[in-house]
Amino acid sequence: MLSITQGIVRRSVARPGLIRPLVKCNARYYSDKPEDSLTWTDFFQLRKQERRINVGSSVFTALVGANVSWAYLSTMEIDPTQMIFGFDPLVVVTAGLMASGALGYLMGPAVGSQVFKLTKGNKLAQYNLKNKEFLKHVIQNRVDASSQSFSNPVPDYYGEKIGSVKEYRQWLRDCHAYAKKAKEFL
């Protein structure tokens, strides 16, 4: 009785091109370093895209929230002579519209992150790994904010404004300058 591997070897003797594609396939899938690893430049571009998607979705959900509340409030019967919570009805309606728009704006990043995950799903695992590594660098290199003052403000404590490798290096220089100033003046 022949095993599967012996059958493949015997067939490959008859057709020598059969084993070679299998080896190439396996080598590609089991290589140590992936061919399309995410560089820091690509990471910062994806980070900027995620931020833009989140802001855009915040504006969109704010408009949707305000329109939905307007659709509800425009059909309500309100007596203009009666006060609502001690306020004029027009003030209450306006506050309701603004509150629903603000709530929609706050819901935007939740929608935007899902859109980002759907559009960049193939790079998402690498992006998350780079993001964790980047945040570790930020936490490790950020300064102690307890000695800040008007003349010596803290340089971007959470690293939110860092958009490139050049800006990251500038942020590091700013952190070192802040620490030096804080040490000298204490």
UniProtKB/Swiss-Prot annotation:
It is found in: Mitochondrion inner membrane. The gene is PAM17. Component of the PAM complex, at least composed of mtHsp70 (SSC1), MGE1, TIM44, PAM16, PAM17 and PAM18. It comes from Candida glabrata (strain ATCC 2001 / BCRC 20586 / JCM 3761 / NBRC 0622 / NRRL Y-65 / CBS 138). The chain crosses the membrane at residues 53-73, 83-103. It comes from the Eukaryota. This is Presequence translocated-associated motor subunit PAM17, mitochondrial. The keyword Ribosomal protein does not apply. Belongs to the PAM17 family. InterPro entries: Pam17 (IPR013875). The keyword Phosphoprotein does not apply. Keywords: Membrane, Mitochondrion, Mitochondrion inner membrane, Protein transport, Transit peptide, Translocation, Transmembrane, Transmembrane helix, Transport. Coiled coil: none annotated. One of its GO terms (cellular component) is PAM complex, Tim23 associated import motor. Component of the PAM complex, a complex required for the translocation of transit peptide-containing proteins from the inner membrane into the mitochondrial matrix in an ATP-dependent manner. Residues 1-30 form a transit peptide. One of its GO terms (biological process) is protein import into mitochondrial matrix. It is a multi-pass membrane protein. Pfam families: Pam17. Its main location: mitochondrion.
